[in-house]
Each structure stands twice: as C-alpha cells, then as structure tokens.
C-alpha cells in the first residue's frame, strides 16, 4: 500500500491536533467536579464513564496523522494505568501541556533535542522532590481517604479500607457484580497465584483481557498435556453438564492447546488453561494446596494416577475463577474446612521444623494464601450503565490505594505538582534550549490544578496564582470550594500515581517534540458498485 509522508512543522501540527482532541475529551473528567463522557458501544447501551484510560482507548480519529497523535497520548495514559492503576487523566493533561508549550518553542526555532534534555532534567528533579514530600500510609483512615478521593465516594473509601484491613495490604481483593443494588464486602476462602492464561483467545472479557469462570471444574495435574485424547472423555462429560473448566498443568503443548482454544472459540465450552505455579517440589506442594482449597485431587504419578483415567469427582470446584495474563484468582473453593485446616497444620509444622530462612518465607507465603482468604467487593446499582460506571470507579480506587501503600501519598488536587515547582526552578540548563525544556515542565506542572479549578467553574489562573503563594500542602479543595491543608482534609494522591503520570507524560511529549516525519498509509479508494438497470435492487 502507498504511503503519505509529512515533514517537520506539518507533521507536528497534525500530531498536535490529535493530542488536543483526545486530551480535551479526557480532561473534562478530572477532579471532584469533573464531568462524565458517554461512549458509543458497537452493541448494547452506551457507556457513561469518567475513567481516563477507558475514554482514551475508545477514541479513534478519522485523520490518520491526528489519530497517531491521539494514540501516543493514550499510550501515556495506558502506561500510567499499567504501573500505578490510576492517574490516567493527570497523565493526559500533563502530556498535552508539555506538547503544546514545546511545539510553540520548536516552531519558533528551538532545538527539540535540547528541549528534550531539559524536560528530562526537570522531570527528574520533580520526581525526586515528590519522594521527599511524600507521607507513608500508616492508618486505616489514610487508606480510606486515598480510595475516597480516587472514587469521589466516602462509602467506597470505607469499603476498600475494610477490605484491606481484613485480608492485609498484600491480600487478594476482587470486584464482582452484585445481584442487588447495594455495594457490599465479603471475605471468602480463596487464593491467587502468579500464572496467567496460555492463550489470549481464552479470555471472556475483551475490555479487561481476562477470563471469568463461574462455578467451574478444576483439573489439577503436574503432568504435561500434549495429547487431547488423554482428557477427551473427561471433556465430553464436562460439556454434557454445561460446565466451564480450568486446567492447571505442568504445560499444555502439541495438539492439545489449539484444540482447547478452537472449542472455546466455537462456543463448545468455556475453558482456560494455566501453567502450574512454582517449580520442582514446591510446585507439587502448591498443587496440593490448590487441591485442598477446591476439593480436588492432584493427578500425579506419585499417587499412581493417570490423566486418561481421571473421573469428574477428582476435579476441584470453586464459585468463581478470574484469570489474567499474569495471575489466577480462585474464589470460594469447594474444599472442606477439615481438609484446609489439615493442610494449614501441615504447613505450620513445616515452618517450625525448617532451618532455611528462604524455605520459611516460601512456606509462610503458602500459609497466607490458604488462611488469608479473598475479599470480594460486590458492586450493586440500579441499572447496567450505572453498574459499569461504579465498577470503573471502584477499580481505580483499589489501584490507587495499593499505589499509596507502595510509595506513600502527597497532597492531592494537583497541589503536590505545584509544590515541587521550587525544586524544578533550581535546575539550570546547560544551553538555552535545555532551559526552555525546564521552563516547559515548570508551566506544565500547574496544568492539572488549573483544569480541576475550571471543571469546578473557577478561573484556573486565579486559583493557581493564589496557590503559588501558599505554604506546602495548602490547596484548593474543589469539592467544598475552600482553601485548606489538603493532607489534613484527606485530599491525597498516591505518590506512585503522581510520579508515574509525570514521567510518562514527559516521555511521550519528548518523543512527539523530536518527531521530524510522520508516515501514514494512503487508503485505497473504494471501488464503486456497478450501476444496475431499472430492475429491483440487489439483496444483501
């Protein structure tokens, strides 16, 4: 296919148009007075959301050059979401601010490479200062505040704080749809291990790229499955019962994996395959843990069991299983309390007898998985549209809270980014262009607070001017229209979220500013259908 190429100013101007179209859509959602965006769906009702990354991913522009600019900003949002789980709108606002200011200077004749160096220096100084002014998360109230700010709901904040209190900061917390209108928390037997699906064609939710299985059977084995005939009788029985299946095996190779995938795609039955966790003897022990939790039997030669002889009553069961590309979460396994308690006692005795610190650590991890349980947040709402929107907010809040536990928190509402301006001003560029790059980041740091104020119906410049004359952590609370200490008021952002948003915005913006040519495909003209006579129109 033929290509069209744009150079220098023309290329950058087209990219900037795409950046602006996406950012102008996303930034309306930032802050407590942010608006919602309605997204058309290919089928069903439209989605209503204020989740930055969801909006960014859904935007596809008609102009190919503009679309490339939009997609690069969406990448900054997506990377921020992948690392920190939140802050996608902040990343988008910062990217637009840096790109816009940078484009003006490049057009005026500044060297984009020098500007890039200045942007990198300023970003490093800002990130270092963020870590210096960061507070550690030490109480349940602080956890609740982080979650409440992210979700714009004190009820959600309290719910997530309760969940973390019950299963620990590193515990497994999952989010499910409720059958009622209330959002509630429950703790059930369950565990999570670090193994994901063997094929992305096994996913059931394409938006989140995860596979959800309700009331599935679980085949647990330490063997490799390469011949589908070994498990065919078992599969046929599962299909007849209309059940789904999770296979945990050493590996699935040969014809077995494509056969399972084909049956999943055709809708014969819902199946997900994952590799067994751990290695060597630890793998066998972990499989026994899973068997105890789910009421299944490990199919292993150690017990004289063969795959081809496996019966349905040797399979484990659970109320729900969620598999992502990296992990598998088993919720509410069907194992008896006696079997689980016996397994727990065995592991505790092994911990007492162990002389190796490494072995003790691994045994304690297994013990925590068996005894800690899984916190399940059941999200309720009156309509499906409201349910989706509420679920997005709770997922963001949970991710924010985990990020705050990792790296602490700073004053929210864009206040922390303005507070680090002083440290950035102390950075001096070696050249005029470097200094220009530093100044670009300086101006961009105030973009989130401006936008939060404007979304609340205030003049962003007036709010910013007043903020720059306040002490650290004193900021504008857009929710109450008051000036107060943001940390004391519970308006806090995870340091990890703020840091990641700034770093990704600076990285993508620097790439855009140093772009000299853009190549796009020229779409082939559609061939017009031959004109018919005066007869009847053709059918589909």
Curated annotation (Swiss-Prot):
SUPFAM superfamilies registered for this protein in UniProt: GroEL apical domain-like, GroEL equatorial domain-like, GroEL-intermediate domain like
Superkingdom of origin organism: Bacteria
Keyword Zinc-finger in annotation: no
Localization per Swiss-Prot or TrEMBL: Cytoplasm
A GO cellular-component term linked to this record: cytoplasm
List of residues binding ATP: 29-32, 86-90, 413, 477-479, 493
Protein name per UniProt: Chaperonin GroEL
Organism: Lactobacillus helveticus (strain DPC 4571)
Gene that this sequence comes from: groEL
């Amino acid at each position: 296919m033929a290509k069209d190429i744009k150079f220098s100013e023309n290329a950058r101007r087209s990219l900037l148009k795409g950046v602006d179209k996406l950012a102008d859509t996303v930034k309306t959602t930032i802050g407590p007075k942010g608006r919602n965006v309605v997204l058309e769906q290919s089928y069903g009702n439209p989605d209503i959301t204020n989740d930055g990354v969801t909006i960014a991913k859904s935007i596809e522009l008609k102009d190919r050059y503009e679309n490339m600019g939009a997609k690069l900003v969406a990448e900054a949002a997506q990377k921020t979401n992948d690392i920190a789980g939140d802050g996608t709108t902040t990343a988008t606002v910062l990217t637009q601010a840096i790109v816009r200011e940078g484009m003006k200077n490049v057009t005026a004749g500044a060297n984009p490479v020098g500007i890039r160096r200045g942007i990198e220096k300023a970003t490093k100084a800002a990130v270092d200062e963020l870590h210096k002014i960061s507070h550690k998360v030490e109480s349940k109230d602080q956890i609740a505040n982080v979650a409440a700010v992210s979700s714009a709901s004190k009820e959600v904040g309290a719910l997530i704080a309760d969940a973390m209190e019950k299963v620990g900061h590193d515990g497994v917390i999952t989010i499910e749809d409720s059958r009622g209108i209330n959002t509630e928390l429950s703790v059930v037997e369950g565990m999570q291990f670090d193994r994901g699906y063997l094929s992305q064609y096994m996913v059931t939710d394409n938006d989140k790229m995860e596979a959800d299985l309700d009331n599935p059977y679980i085949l647990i084995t330490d063997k490799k499955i390469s011949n589908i005939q070994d498990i065919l009788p078992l599969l046929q029985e599962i299909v007849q019962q209309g059940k789904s299946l999770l296979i945990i095996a050493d590996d699935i190779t040969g014809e077995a994996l494509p056969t399972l995938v084909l049956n999943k795609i055709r809708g014969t039955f819902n199946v997900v395959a994952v590799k067994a966790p751990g290695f060597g003897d630890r793998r066998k022990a972990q499989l026994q843990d899973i068997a105890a939790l789910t009421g299944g039997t490990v199919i292993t030669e150690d017990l004289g069991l063969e795959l081809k002889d496996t019966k349905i009553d040797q399979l484990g069961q659970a109320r729900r299983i969620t598999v992502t590309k990296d992990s598998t979460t088993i919720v509410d396994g069907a194992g008896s309390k006696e079997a689980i308690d016996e397994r727990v006692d065995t592991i505790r005795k092994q911990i007492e007898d162990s002389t190796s610190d490494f072995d003790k650590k691994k045994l304690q991890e297994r013990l925590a998985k068996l005894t800690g349980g899984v916190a399940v947040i059941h999200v309720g709402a009156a309509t499906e549209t409201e349910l989706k929107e509420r679920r997005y907010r709770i997922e963001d809040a949970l991710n924010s809270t985990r990020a705050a536990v990792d790296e602490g928190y700073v004053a929210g509402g864009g206040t922390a980014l303005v507070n680090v301006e002083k440290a950035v001003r102390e950075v001096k560029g070696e050249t005029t262009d470097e200094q220009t790059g530093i100044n670009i980041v300086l101006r961009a740091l105030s973009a989130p607070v401006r936008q939060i104020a404007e979304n609340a119906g205030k003049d962003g410049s007036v709010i910013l001017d007043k903020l720059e004359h306040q002490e650290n952590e004193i900021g504008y609370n857009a929710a109450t229209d008051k000036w107060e200490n943001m940390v004391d008021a519970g308006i806090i952002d995870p340091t990890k979220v703020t840091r990641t948003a700034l770093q990704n915005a600076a990285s993508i913006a620097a790439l855009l500013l140093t772009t000299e040519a853009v190549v796009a495909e020229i779409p082939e003209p559609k061939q017009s259908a031959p004109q018919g006579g005066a007869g009847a129109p053709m059918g589909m």
